């Protein structure tokens, strides 16, 4: 009889916990939807991504450092992505990574990685991923509990500035990029397609206004190249 009562109590407690868990899940979903409704934006979330070989996957999922990272950055279990990767393959073969940054993550979300090698093995691969995240306004943190490699208070994005064939991942510092248009060269192009004509006409005694009229260009173009060192 006592055994039956104990079994009934356990069953009752389990049902109560299930109902309570379901209630919490619905409340969390309601709060999340309310935040979106009230502010018009998604709540900022954190994701963890790492790569491994087929032999390493089980050891990574059980590793204490993964639990520490998830706790530090408030990462939900469903936001942890561990992808089996052949290190000889290019980053475009990392299907789960592309799915994560292109479709799952939103603006102001954070991607936590143990090191930059998770995003590619070449400078070009790393640049493409980092620039994409920068344009989408997503943050990337390079963090590992053992080495305490983590960004400073000012830095939000691990930005690759090294120009080399082989990358020493552990010596790269996490730093925030200030260059929104880094591929665009700063300043005006040296010289002008009218440089030669302006030089000849100036030496011929023509005034700035006359040169502008002859070449059908603006007076400011002539003035820009008149005494700035391009024309002596």
From Swiss-Prot:
It comes from the Bacteria. InterPro entries: HTH_Sigma70_ECF-like, Resolvase-like_N_sf. GO terms for molecular function: DNA binding; DNA strand exchange activity. This is Uncharacterized protein YagL. It comes from Escherichia coli (strain K12).
